């Protein structure tokens, strides 16, 4: 199986050990070819927290760039093509927009998604507890089909033990771990 799918599936397995709220639907018809070109589109921000989608998108690009079997398109090129074809929402792509991105960026796959929750909750005993929730889709540009999808939810206090040990206190740190 390709590195991209293994990484995304591994992310879901990792979070399964940390979360009772993890939901993941996994489907794949065939593994990605070695050297597949992937573009990460800007995640849609449904959380209401300013800057959340930019951070999650950046973390996703960094996580995928660690792989040796795929090539991740530079975000500046992705943004330029989205402007060129007037694509305003990366989560509501038409087939024509997907075809335009695929030919303009010379990619075979698109990663897109939404930031559902990105906030901190006050806890009188532990202070601020971060919470992050995202959904991610991997789309095959040739068939216009979603070949993988997943949802990940995490709270900073999920791995907490006695006296607050093990709790994640930073929203950015939790977001980074959710994407990994």
PLM segments and residue spans:
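Short, solvent-exposed loop/turn segments at secondary-structure boundaries
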Residues: 50-52, 123-127
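N-terminal segment of the mature soluble domain
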Residues: 35-42, 47-114, 145-149, 177-180
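Bacterial N-terminal signal peptides
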Residues: 6-16
